[in-house]
Swiss-Prot record:
Transmembrane region(s): 13-33
Protein name: Very-long-chain 3-oxoacyl-CoA reductase 1
UniProt lineage: Eukaryota, Viridiplantae, Streptophyta, Embryophyta, Tracheophyta
Pathway: Lipid metabolism; fatty acid biosynthesis
List of residues binding substrate: 191
Function: Beta-ketoacyl-coenzyme A reductase required for the elongation of fatty acids precursors of sphingolipids, triacylglycerols, cuticular waxes and suberin. Responsible for the first reduction step in very long-chain fatty acids (VLCFAs) synthesis. Decreased expression of KCR1 (RNAi) leads to plants with fused vegetative and reproductive organs, and abnormal trichome, epidermal cell and root morphology. Cannot be complemented by KCR2.
UniProt organism field: Arabidopsis thaliana
EC top class, as a word: oxidoreductase
Tissues expressing the protein: Expressed in green siliques, flowers, inflorescence stems, leaves and roots.
Amino acid sequence: MEICTYFKSQPTWLLILFVLGSISIFKFIFTLLRSFYIYFLRPSKNLRRYGSWAIITGPTDGIGKAFAFQLAQKGLNLILVARNPDKLKDVSDSIRSKYSQTQILTVVMDFSGDIDEGVKRIKESIEGLDVGILINNAGMSYPYAKYFHEVDEELINNLIKINVEGTTKVTQAVLPNMLKRKKGAIINMGSGAAALIPSYPFYSVYAGAKTYVDQFTKCLHVEYKKSGIDVQCQVPLYVATKMTKIRRASFLVASPEGYAKAALRFVGYEAQCTPYWPHALMGAVVSALPESVFESFNIKRCLQIRKKGLQKDSMKKE
Protein backbone atom coordinates (compact mmCIF):
# COMPACT_ATOMS: atom_id res chain seq x y z
CA MET A 1 0.00 0.00 0.00
CA GLU A 2 2.80 2.39 0.86
CA ILE A 3 4.35 1.79 -2.57
CA CYS A 4 1.04 2.53 -4.30
CA THR A 5 0.64 5.69 -2.25
CA TYR A 6 4.17 6.75 -3.11
CA PHE A 7 3.62 6.30 -6.85
CA LYS A 8 0.30 8.15 -6.73
CA SER A 9 2.04 11.09 -5.12
CA GLN A 10 4.56 11.41 -7.96
CA PRO A 11 4.01 13.61 -11.03
CA THR A 12 2.78 11.90 -14.20
CA TRP A 13 5.93 12.68 -16.20
CA LEU A 14 8.08 10.91 -13.59
CA LEU A 15 5.87 7.82 -13.68
CA ILE A 16 6.12 7.73 -17.48
CA LEU A 17 9.91 7.94 -17.28
CA PHE A 18 9.93 5.16 -14.69
CA VAL A 19 7.82 2.87 -16.90
CA LEU A 20 9.91 3.58 -20.00
CA GLY A 21 13.13 3.04 -18.04
CA SER A 22 11.83 -0.26 -16.64
CA ILE A 23 10.89 -1.46 -20.13
CA SER A 24 14.35 -0.54 -21.45
CA ILE A 25 16.10 -2.38 -18.62
CA PHE A 26 13.89 -5.45 -19.08
CA LYS A 27 14.54 -5.41 -22.84
CA PHE A 28 18.31 -5.16 -22.28
CA ILE A 29 18.33 -8.04 -19.78
CA PHE A 30 16.14 -10.17 -22.06
CA THR A 31 18.43 -9.51 -25.06
CA LEU A 32 21.50 -10.35 -22.98
CA LEU A 33 20.05 -13.63 -21.70
CA ARG A 34 18.76 -14.59 -25.15
CA SER A 35 22.18 -13.93 -26.71
CA PHE A 36 23.89 -15.99 -24.02
CA TYR A 37 21.55 -18.89 -24.73
CA ILE A 38 22.00 -18.65 -28.52
CA TYR A 39 25.79 -18.48 -28.45
CA PHE A 40 26.62 -20.80 -25.56
CA LEU A 41 23.69 -23.07 -24.67
CA ARG A 42 21.51 -23.66 -27.73
CA PRO A 43 22.07 -27.14 -29.21
CA SER A 44 23.20 -27.45 -32.81
CA LYS A 45 21.11 -29.31 -35.39
CA ASN A 46 22.00 -32.77 -36.63
CA LEU A 47 23.25 -31.80 -40.09
CA ARG A 48 22.97 -35.33 -41.45
CA ARG A 49 19.19 -35.11 -41.17
CA TYR A 50 19.26 -32.84 -44.23
CA GLY A 51 21.03 -35.45 -46.36
CA SER A 52 24.34 -37.27 -46.68
CA TRP A 53 25.99 -34.89 -49.18
CA ALA A 54 27.06 -31.25 -48.87
CA ILE A 55 28.15 -28.84 -51.63
CA ILE A 56 30.71 -26.16 -50.84
CA THR A 57 31.79 -23.48 -53.30
CA GLY A 58 35.23 -21.94 -52.80
CA PRO A 59 36.53 -24.80 -50.60
CA THR A 60 40.26 -24.59 -51.38
CA ASP A 61 41.17 -21.81 -48.92
CA GLY A 62 39.97 -19.99 -45.83
CA ILE A 63 36.43 -20.41 -44.56
CA GLY A 64 35.37 -22.76 -47.37
CA LYS A 65 38.21 -25.16 -46.64
CA ALA A 66 37.41 -25.07 -42.92
CA PHE A 67 33.76 -25.83 -43.70
CA ALA A 68 34.82 -28.86 -45.75
CA PHE A 69 36.86 -30.33 -42.90
CA GLN A 70 34.13 -29.65 -40.33
CA LEU A 71 31.44 -31.31 -42.46
CA ALA A 72 33.66 -34.32 -43.16
CA GLN A 73 34.22 -34.65 -39.42
CA LYS A 74 30.44 -34.72 -38.96
CA GLY A 75 30.15 -37.62 -41.42
CA LEU A 76 28.93 -35.85 -44.55
CA ASN A 77 30.17 -36.57 -48.06
CA LEU A 78 31.38 -33.59 -50.05
CA ILE A 79 31.01 -31.99 -53.47
CA LEU A 80 33.73 -29.36 -53.75
CA VAL A 81 33.36 -26.60 -56.36
CA ALA A 82 36.28 -24.35 -57.32
CA ARG A 83 38.19 -23.15 -60.37
CA ASN A 84 41.63 -24.66 -59.67
CA PRO A 85 41.76 -28.46 -60.22
CA ASP A 86 45.15 -28.78 -58.51
CA LYS A 87 43.92 -27.06 -55.35
CA LEU A 88 40.75 -29.16 -55.44
CA LYS A 89 42.89 -32.30 -55.52
CA ASP A 90 45.08 -31.06 -52.67
CA VAL A 91 42.18 -30.27 -50.35
CA SER A 92 40.41 -33.53 -51.28
CA ASP A 93 43.53 -35.56 -50.47
CA SER A 94 43.96 -33.71 -47.17
CA ILE A 95 40.38 -34.45 -46.14
CA ARG A 96 40.60 -38.12 -47.16
CA SER A 97 43.83 -38.57 -45.21
CA LYS A 98 42.06 -37.41 -42.05
CA TYR A 99 38.54 -38.75 -42.71
CA SER A 100 38.97 -41.83 -44.88
CA GLN A 101 35.24 -42.65 -44.90
CA THR A 102 34.35 -39.37 -46.64
CA GLN A 103 33.32 -39.58 -50.28
CA ILE A 104 34.43 -36.53 -52.26
CA LEU A 105 33.43 -35.31 -55.71
CA THR A 106 34.98 -32.24 -57.32
CA VAL A 107 33.55 -29.82 -59.87
CA VAL A 108 35.80 -27.37 -61.71
CA MET A 109 33.97 -24.05 -62.04
CA ASP A 110 35.33 -20.55 -62.60
CA PHE A 111 32.83 -18.13 -61.07
CA SER A 112 34.40 -15.27 -63.02
CA GLY A 113 34.05 -17.25 -66.27
CA ASP A 114 31.22 -19.26 -67.80
CA ILE A 115 28.87 -19.68 -64.84
CA ASP A 116 26.19 -21.46 -66.85
CA GLU A 117 28.65 -24.16 -67.90
CA GLY A 118 29.77 -24.57 -64.29
CA VAL A 119 26.17 -24.82 -63.09
CA LYS A 120 25.55 -27.50 -65.70
CA ARG A 121 28.44 -29.53 -64.24
CA ILE A 122 27.03 -29.12 -60.74
CA LYS A 123 23.62 -30.40 -61.86
CA GLU A 124 25.27 -33.44 -63.43
CA SER A 125 27.33 -34.16 -60.31
CA ILE A 126 24.36 -34.07 -57.91
CA GLU A 127 22.03 -36.22 -59.98
CA GLY A 128 20.85 -39.15 -57.87
CA LEU A 129 22.52 -37.86 -54.67
CA ASP A 130 20.70 -36.74 -51.54
CA VAL A 131 22.34 -33.33 -51.31
CA GLY A 132 21.22 -31.84 -48.02
CA ILE A 133 23.48 -28.82 -47.57
CA LEU A 134 24.68 -26.08 -49.91
CA ILE A 135 27.25 -23.55 -48.70
CA ASN A 136 27.62 -20.65 -51.13
CA ASN A 137 31.03 -19.55 -49.92
CA ALA A 138 32.74 -18.47 -53.17
CA GLY A 139 33.22 -14.72 -53.19
CA MET A 140 35.64 -11.88 -53.80
CA SER A 141 36.33 -8.37 -52.55
CA TYR A 142 38.54 -5.44 -53.56
CA PRO A 143 42.33 -5.83 -53.60
CA TYR A 144 42.33 -2.77 -51.32
CA ALA A 145 40.10 0.22 -50.51
CA LYS A 146 39.21 2.34 -53.55
CA TYR A 147 37.01 5.27 -54.41
CA PHE A 148 34.15 4.09 -56.62
CA HIS A 149 35.40 6.06 -59.65
CA GLU A 150 38.75 4.23 -59.38
CA VAL A 151 37.23 0.75 -59.64
CA ASP A 152 37.84 -0.66 -63.12
CA GLU A 153 35.15 -2.37 -65.18
CA GLU A 154 36.68 -5.84 -64.86
CA LEU A 155 36.65 -5.67 -61.06
CA ILE A 156 33.05 -4.43 -61.00
CA ASN A 157 31.95 -7.25 -63.32
CA ASN A 158 33.75 -9.90 -61.26
CA LEU A 159 32.38 -8.59 -57.95
CA ILE A 160 28.83 -8.83 -59.27
CA LYS A 161 29.36 -12.06 -61.19
CA ILE A 162 31.00 -14.02 -58.37
CA ASN A 163 29.10 -12.64 -55.38
CA VAL A 164 25.67 -12.18 -56.96
CA GLU A 165 25.25 -14.24 -60.12
CA GLY A 166 27.23 -17.22 -58.86
CA THR A 167 25.33 -17.46 -55.58
CA THR A 168 21.98 -17.05 -57.33
CA LYS A 169 22.50 -19.61 -60.07
CA VAL A 170 24.12 -22.29 -57.90
CA THR A 171 21.23 -21.97 -55.45
CA GLN A 172 18.72 -22.33 -58.28
CA ALA A 173 20.54 -25.43 -59.53
CA VAL A 174 20.56 -27.22 -56.17
CA LEU A 175 17.19 -26.18 -54.74
CA PRO A 176 14.90 -28.46 -56.85
CA ASN A 177 16.75 -31.53 -55.55
CA MET A 178 16.03 -30.42 -51.98
CA LEU A 179 12.39 -29.65 -52.72
CA LYS A 180 11.82 -33.18 -54.00
CA ARG A 181 13.00 -34.56 -50.67
CA LYS A 182 11.35 -31.73 -48.67
CA LYS A 183 14.50 -31.04 -46.67
CA GLY A 184 17.73 -29.12 -47.05
CA ALA A 185 19.85 -26.25 -45.77
CA ILE A 186 21.31 -23.41 -47.83
CA ILE A 187 23.95 -21.18 -46.25
CA ASN A 188 24.88 -18.03 -48.14
CA MET A 189 27.95 -16.14 -47.01
CA GLY A 190 27.08 -12.50 -46.62
CA SER A 191 29.18 -9.91 -44.85
CA GLY A 192 29.06 -7.69 -41.81
CA ALA A 193 29.94 -4.92 -44.28
CA ALA A 194 26.37 -5.17 -45.56
CA ALA A 195 24.50 -5.98 -42.36
CA LEU A 196 26.33 -4.97 -39.19
CA ILE A 197 27.71 -1.53 -40.00
CA PRO A 198 25.98 1.59 -41.36
CA SER A 199 28.12 1.81 -44.51
CA TYR A 200 31.31 0.41 -46.00
CA PRO A 201 32.96 3.26 -47.92
CA PHE A 202 35.67 2.49 -50.48
CA TYR A 203 34.22 -1.01 -50.91
CA SER A 204 30.85 0.11 -52.27
CA VAL A 205 30.33 -2.54 -54.97
CA TYR A 206 31.34 -5.37 -52.62
CA ALA A 207 29.01 -4.08 -49.90
CA GLY A 208 26.21 -3.69 -52.43
CA ALA A 209 26.70 -7.23 -53.73
CA LYS A 210 26.61 -8.67 -50.22
CA THR A 211 23.49 -6.65 -49.45
CA TYR A 212 21.87 -8.44 -52.38
CA VAL A 213 22.94 -11.80 -50.92
CA ASP A 214 21.44 -10.84 -47.55
CA GLN A 215 18.05 -9.78 -48.96
CA PHE A 216 17.98 -12.66 -51.47
CA THR A 217 18.50 -15.10 -48.60
CA LYS A 218 15.83 -13.57 -46.37
CA CYS A 219 13.29 -13.85 -49.19
CA LEU A 220 14.16 -17.51 -49.84
CA HIS A 221 13.96 -18.21 -46.11
CA VAL A 222 10.33 -17.07 -46.12
CA GLU A 223 9.49 -18.73 -49.47
CA TYR A 224 10.77 -22.21 -48.60
CA LYS A 225 10.53 -22.49 -44.81
CA LYS A 226 7.27 -24.47 -45.04
CA SER A 227 8.88 -26.75 -47.65
CA GLY A 228 11.47 -27.98 -45.15
CA ILE A 229 14.32 -25.87 -46.56
CA ASP A 230 16.34 -23.77 -44.09
CA VAL A 231 17.91 -20.81 -45.90
CA GLN A 232 20.34 -18.66 -43.97
CA CYS A 233 22.67 -15.73 -44.57
CA GLN A 234 25.73 -15.60 -42.32
CA VAL A 235 27.28 -12.16 -41.83
CA PRO A 236 30.75 -12.34 -40.30
CA LEU A 237 33.10 -9.42 -39.78
CA TYR A 238 36.84 -10.08 -39.83
CA VAL A 239 38.22 -13.57 -40.50
CA ALA A 240 41.92 -14.27 -41.09
CA THR A 241 41.85 -15.28 -44.78
CA LYS A 242 43.58 -14.43 -48.04
CA MET A 243 40.59 -12.33 -49.11
CA THR A 244 40.70 -10.10 -46.01
CA LYS A 245 44.52 -10.05 -46.09
CA ILE A 246 44.55 -10.53 -42.31
CA ARG A 247 47.27 -13.00 -41.40
CA ARG A 248 46.63 -13.72 -37.74
CA ALA A 249 43.50 -14.57 -35.80
CA SER A 250 42.71 -12.78 -32.54
CA PHE A 251 39.76 -12.26 -30.22
CA LEU A 252 37.98 -10.04 -32.76
CA VAL A 253 39.41 -11.75 -35.86
CA ALA A 254 38.20 -15.33 -36.22
CA SER A 255 40.38 -18.09 -37.62
CA PRO A 256 38.72 -19.94 -40.54
CA GLU A 257 38.47 -23.06 -38.37
CA GLY A 258 36.99 -21.17 -35.42
CA TYR A 259 34.49 -19.43 -37.64
CA ALA A 260 33.38 -22.61 -39.46
CA LYS A 261 32.90 -24.47 -36.19
CA ALA A 262 30.73 -21.66 -34.82
CA ALA A 263 28.88 -21.27 -38.13
CA LEU A 264 27.66 -24.86 -38.31
CA ARG A 265 26.06 -24.51 -34.87
CA PHE A 266 23.72 -21.89 -36.36
CA VAL A 267 22.53 -23.87 -39.38
CA GLY A 268 18.76 -24.35 -39.32
CA TYR A 269 17.95 -21.39 -37.11
CA GLU A 270 17.76 -17.66 -37.98
CA ALA A 271 17.44 -16.28 -41.52
CA GLN A 272 20.40 -14.01 -40.78
CA CYS A 273 23.05 -14.58 -38.14
CA THR A 274 26.52 -13.66 -36.95
CA PRO A 275 27.84 -17.00 -35.62
CA TYR A 276 31.15 -15.81 -34.13
CA TRP A 277 30.06 -14.07 -30.93
CA PRO A 278 32.86 -11.43 -30.76
CA HIS A 279 31.64 -10.25 -34.19
CA ALA A 280 28.12 -9.91 -32.80
CA LEU A 281 29.55 -7.94 -29.89
CA MET A 282 31.34 -5.62 -32.31
CA GLY A 283 28.11 -5.17 -34.25
CA ALA A 284 26.24 -4.26 -31.06
CA VAL A 285 28.88 -1.67 -30.13
CA VAL A 286 28.77 -0.13 -33.62
CA SER A 287 24.96 0.05 -33.57
CA ALA A 288 25.12 1.89 -30.24
CA LEU A 289 27.42 4.58 -31.65
CA PRO A 290 26.22 7.59 -33.64
CA GLU A 291 26.73 6.84 -37.35
CA SER A 292 28.91 9.92 -37.77
CA VAL A 293 31.34 8.68 -35.09
CA PHE A 294 31.72 5.24 -36.66
CA GLU A 295 31.96 6.61 -40.21
CA SER A 296 34.70 9.05 -39.20
CA PHE A 297 36.74 6.17 -37.75
CA ASN A 298 36.01 3.86 -40.68
CA ILE A 299 36.94 6.43 -43.34
CA LYS A 300 40.34 6.99 -41.70
CA ARG A 301 40.95 3.24 -41.53
CA CYS A 302 39.96 2.68 -45.16
CA LEU A 303 42.09 5.58 -46.40
CA GLN A 304 45.10 4.04 -44.64
CA ILE A 305 44.40 0.73 -46.40
CA ARG A 306 44.06 2.60 -49.71
CA LYS A 307 47.37 4.39 -49.16
CA LYS A 308 49.21 1.10 -48.54
CA GLY A 309 47.56 -0.47 -51.58
CA LEU A 310 48.60 2.40 -53.85
CA GLN A 311 52.15 2.17 -52.54
CA LYS A 312 52.30 -1.55 -53.35
CA ASP A 313 50.90 -0.88 -56.84
CA SER A 314 53.55 1.77 -57.52
CA MET A 315 56.31 -0.57 -56.32
CA LYS A 316 55.09 -3.28 -58.71
CA LYS A 317 55.20 -0.84 -61.63
CA GLU A 318 58.78 0.11 -60.80
